[in-house]
């Protein structure tokens, strides 16, 4: 009984903390849409804000789904309703659908701000304007939109219909397009630039390399013929961590070093920071 009560409290906590994501997303969208300074149009904004805007859309639309899911889990455990648990007559695959409908967009909540940070760092240390500003901005919105259409690729071996598997596979490959647009535009920004390899730039370059590996391994998981063999293997773990650690963490560390002098008024030690960037890589 005590163990069951602990789970109910955990579900309650998860439900309540979801409001922080929803309200933060609303705050960012309202701020970006209504509180830009005079003269700043949509295409005058920093690309980091485009990434934050796309992230906020995901937070507002995806978080309520996981909130409903944990609420149903609470009701099921408290009143023995048959929703997800087979012993009560529920369907665990339904839980998978609800869980992944939130949890796949959630990885884009983590990676999109990192992409925005890289889009800010590269033009500064390549000493030339970002290449393809509008393409990068629109690709952030495209990633946010497509992120809601691919959750079934986590469930290729769960007993879905062949048609559903085919559509989810196709849509998963499609999300590589706006991602590749970013990679190619970042590379074009570097081309013929006067590159300074300061610490933020090292993290940004590390992001591009490691994230590209993560993206390419994702193509093998998107393809039905290879996914059925790779599901539940360390290949999936490697793909995820190349994207989340090689991507998100590298970008966030780069952003911390990039904005640290502006935030604190103090410069970080360049030698030790470069060494840490190489060690993290």
Language-model features: locations:
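Membrane-embedded and interfacial regions of multi-pass energy-transducing membrane proteins
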Residues: 1-281
């Amino acid at each position: 009984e005590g163990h069951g009560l602990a789970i109910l409290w955990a579900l309650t906590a998860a439900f309540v903390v979801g409001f922080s994501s929803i309200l933060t997303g609303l705050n960012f969208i309202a701020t970006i849409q209504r509180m830009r300074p005079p003269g700043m149009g949509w295409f005058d904004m920093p690309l980091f804000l485009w990434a934050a805007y796309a992230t906020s859309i995901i937070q507002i639309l995806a978080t309520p789904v996981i909130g409903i899911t944990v609420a149903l889990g609470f009701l099921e455990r408290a009143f023995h309703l048959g929703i997800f648990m087979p012993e009560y007559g529920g369907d665990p695959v339904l839980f998978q659908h609800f869980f992944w409908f939130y949890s796949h967009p959630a990885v884009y909540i983590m990676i999109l701000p990192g992409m925005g940070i890289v889009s800010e760092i590269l033009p500064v240390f390549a000493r030339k304007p970002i290449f393809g500003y509008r393409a990068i901005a629109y690709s952030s919105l495209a990633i946010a939109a497509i992120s809601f259409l691919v959750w079934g690729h986590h469930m290729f071996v769960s007993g879905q219909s062949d048609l559903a598997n085919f559509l989810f596979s196709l849509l998963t490959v499609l999300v590589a397009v706006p991602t590749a647009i970013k990679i190619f535009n970042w590379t074009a920004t570097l081309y013929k630039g006067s590159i300074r390899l300061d610490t933020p730039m090292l993290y940004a370059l590390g992001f591009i390399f490691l994230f590209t590996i993560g993206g390419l391994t994702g193509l093998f998981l998107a393809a039905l013929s290879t996914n059925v063999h790779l599901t539940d293997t360390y290949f999936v773990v490697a793909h995820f961590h190349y994207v989340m650690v090689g991507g998100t963490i590298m970008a966030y560390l780069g952003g911390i070093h990039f904005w640290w002098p502006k935030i604190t008024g103090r410069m970080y030690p360049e030698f030790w920071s470069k060494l840490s960037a190489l060690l993290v890589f």
